[in-house]
Amino acid sequence: MPSDTLIEAPSRQLYTPEERARRDATVWTTVQGVLAPLQFLVFLVSLALVVRFMLTGLGYDLATASIVLKTFVLLTIMVTGAIWEKVVFGQYLFAPAFFWEDVFSFAVISLHLAYVWALFAGWPHDTQMWIALAAYSAYVINAAQFVWKLRMARLESERRL
């Protein structure tokens, strides 16, 4: 017999109380909190330089340097993020709470490194920039995943109060 009330499936909290305490106590949370907006700022500047090059053909060297810098910042935040996950969740990557974000992060890293490979392989400038734009598109999706998780963590914290 059908029920008139919906039964809500139990949802796993993003952090257990122990994980939340480790998250709040580790310096790696601060490191991530600094690197994430820095990476976004580097992304915005680099995106503008890449689009400028694609539209005008001017500024290849500056656009290239900005993409290499963006790639370096991405790799830095990935390494420090893995350390953060180890401290908070007990494993370097693919903790259940951030599994899909980590999976997609590898796609983002792969595209950024494909750009670096294309750069050193001497591929045509336009091709390099298209790869960078693909990497940046993937980065935006991945950043949105993390912003969503941050929002969920804040809502979870508010519910606990």
Q: Which residue stretches match the model-derived regions?
A:
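Hydrophobic cores of alpha-helical transmembrane segments in multi-pass integral membrane proteins
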Residues: 2-10, 30-54, 60-88, 97-151
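Cytosolic juxtamembrane amphipathic/interface segments immediately preceding
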Residues: 16-29
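Interfacial helix-loop-helix linkers and transmembrane-helix boundary segments
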Residues: 93-95
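Short, highly charged, low-complexity non-transmembrane loops/tails of multi-pass membrane proteins
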Residues: 154-161
